[in-house]
Amino acid sequence: MVDSFSIYKTALLLSMLATSNAQQVGTYTAETHPSLTWQTCSGSGSCTTTSGSVVIDANWRWVHEVGGYTNCYSGNTWDSSICSTDTTCASECALEGATYESTYGVTTSGSSLRLNFVTTASQKNIGSRLYLLADDSTYETFKLFNREFTFDVDVSNLPCGLNGALYFVSMDADGGVSRFPTNKAGAKYGTGYCDSQCPRDLKFIDGQANIEGWEPSSTDVNAGTGNHGSCCPEMDIWEANSISSAFTAHPCDSVQQTMCTGDTCGGTYSDTTDRYSGTCDPDGCDFNPYRFGNTNFYGPGKTVDNSKPFTVVTQFITHDGTDTGTLTEIRRLYVQNGVVIGNGPSTYTAASGNSITESFCKAEKTLFGDTNVFETHGGLSAMGDALGDGMVLVLSLWDDHAADMLWLDSDYPTTSCASSPGVARGTCPTTTGNATYVEANYPNSYVTYSNIKFGTLNSTYSGTSSGGSSSSSTTLTTKASTSTTSSKTTTTTSKTSTTSSSSTNVAQLYGQCGGQGWTGPTTCASGTCTKQNDYYSQCL
């Protein structure tokens, strides 16, 4: 029989070994998360305010020697004199707390979050990536089936080459602590990032460092590429600047974050020939109105006038209108000056519509001549698996050292004729998105996200529908009141609205109901089927 003292010694030894190999936390700067309120809304039109907070990603943090001030990572290079392997760097290096405004240019006020592009303190910081927290050590997760996600945005100060991106990824809610016990930092310090590019520029993945095989970037003084990448599904709700915008679905083979190795990761960080070698779809099925020929829909002075703030609504429609149904459509609406604006439709007969559906994605890939990796990795069904499983909200501002953001706001690829379908994505010249140029010439750029709302369909916004006659317009009014529940203060908004039918034989409000080549429903559950052009009619 083993005596209790022997058991104690063994447990103590194992505990010491685990700690010695763990991803560490610094003690010099207290981690205080900036507060950010957001709302959950129901079909009755009532919205409850939640007092949340945001945390900056671990990749932006000071990484230093445990118990000292020597940098483990400086510029875009690891200090191999401190550690030289993924496991030893995890035990010898610590992630430090953040000073959000002075170091990273991140400020919050109520429901508003502002991200500055370039912030100069002791070092120059470029951009940022933050996550919404449920509590100090857990990311907020959203299950988006049969729901909508809404926010206000100001992109008027984002020129060519910048991307104010708000999106969802399938990160672990605790930042990876449960699955990878060597990760002692967790969500509190912004660990566990992943996306559909399987990024290899992360300093830590799965509780270990990424020093092995690390190659400093030749163009980015702050970044490099390691042997490992971090993969997971990604739903880009919003990627935009003052010129162009897009929303994109990126499915993966697994709904859970996974680590990959080398060029088998695929995506942006692998050789061009290996772009599609990974377990995720790096291209996705995207909708950029400009790319689909609708060049007057989004931009300064256009239908959605981005010289001033506006509201973005994204709806996730299931086949039977239930939370457990199959994802069939990802729909976009805008609200500006009290008017609800349906997404600008494609002008191409071969790929008609204004939302992401399985048939639209297939038609898009065929029309543009793109490799249909979306279908290879499960298409809208696989994207639905991730959305139903729960995803973490990311709010970011970044520039692009790999492709100069041309894929968003210019002609891309640059070797193709700009008049070919799908090549022109915006009006930016192909010479303007260079990251070094943007950082030097537009350091004062910023994006503001505010009034985040999540709820049942048609519960998070109000306004008068655009287009069509007055008989097809539905006026939505709001009336605010306050109430206190438990220890939280909640704001309840009452709203009269028209609720979409869940029938599969009719088009939903703001959905497509006709046009050349259209084979879907032609009757509206709400509103009137209104012709926008020969290829697109919409329920308004």
UniProtKB/Swiss-Prot annotation:
Region: Disordered, residue numbers: 464-502
Residue segments, region Catalytic: 23-459
Protein name: 1,4-beta-D-glucan cellobiohydrolase B
Classification via PANTHER family: 1,4-BETA-D-GLUCAN CELLOBIOHYDROLASE B, GLYCOSIDE HYDROLASE FAMILY 7 PROTEIN
GO molecular-function terms, A-Z: cellulose 1,4-beta-cellobiosidase activity; cellulose binding
Source organism (scientific name): Aspergillus aculeatus
Its job: The biological conversion of cellulose to glucose generally requires three types of hydrolytic enzymes: (1) Endoglucanases which cut internal beta-1,4-glucosidic bonds; (2) Exocellobiohydrolases that cut the disaccharide cellobiose from the non-reducing end of the cellulose polymer chain; (3) Beta-1,4-glucosidases which hydrolyze the cellobiose and other short cello-oligosaccharides to glucose.
Enzyme class of the recorded protein, top EC level: hydrolase
Residues covered by region (Ser/Thr-rich linker): 460-505
One Gene Ontology cellular component annotation held by this UniProt entry: extracellular region
Known catalytic reactions: Hydrolysis of (1->4)-beta-D-glucosidic linkages in cellulose and cellotetraose, releasing cellobiose from the non-reducing ends of the chains
Domain CBM1 as annotated: residue spans: 505-540
Signal peptide boundaries: 1-22
Keywords recorded for this protein, A-Z: Carbohydrate metabolism, Cellulose degradation, Disulfide bond, Glycoprotein, Glycosidase, Hydrolase, Polysaccharide degradation, Signal
Top-level taxonomy: Eukaryota, Fungi, Dikarya, Ascomycota, Pezizomycotina
Gene Ontology process terms (BP): cellulose catabolic process
Glycan attachment positions: 434, 458
Entry similarity comment: Belongs to the glycosyl hydrolase 7 (cellulase C) family.
